[in-house]
Amino acid sequence: MQNFKTSCIECGGEVAIKKGTYRFRESGLDTVVLKGVEIVRCPACGDESPIIANLDGLLRTLALAIVTSKLPLTGPEVRYLRKYLGMSGDQFARMLHTDKSTLSKWETGAVNIGSKSDLLIRAVALHLGRGLRDEAEEAVRGFELIDEESANVPHRIEVDAATLTFAYS
């Protein structure tokens, strides 16, 4: 961990870098927390930003955490996987044999994602996602255990930024 000061890009004030926990809202998910990450913080304006050494690895780890979760996919998680795969709404909808309107309703939470569509989204992400297939083989066997009763139970994904491991809480 570096302990130096520099200027804030927002207000020009001095910033400090400290190791800590950071809610990774930039992912598009309110449920992701990075643990053990260096955070640049400006006391003057309150701006905070994480220092992420391996962004590709972090994004892959997050996709893996979503795909292997035993909880039904949420709309924001579907959006994250689509963007992780680099697909437009039209492309992803065609891949899932649905229309863009239905996909949009899933992503915004206006309509629940059915269990078969949930499994298809995970399978597509595993097939097309960089490096996901090999890492998730064991989890695929547990897909039939997805707990639809827990669909509305809030959960959080904690990602260790240094080891790129994750846990659900």
Report residues per predicted region.
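Short alpha-helical "recognition helix" segments of helix-turn-helix
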Residues: L81, D90-R94, L103
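Recognition helix of helix-turn-helix/homeodomain-like DNA-binding domains
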Residues: H97-I113, I121
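N-terminal cysteine/histidine-rich coordination modules
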Residues: M1-A65
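DNA major-groove recognition helix of helix-turn-helix/homeodomain DNA-binding modules
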Residues: S115-D134
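Helix-turn-helix/homeodomain-like alpha-helical modules used for DNA recognition
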Residues: R133-S169
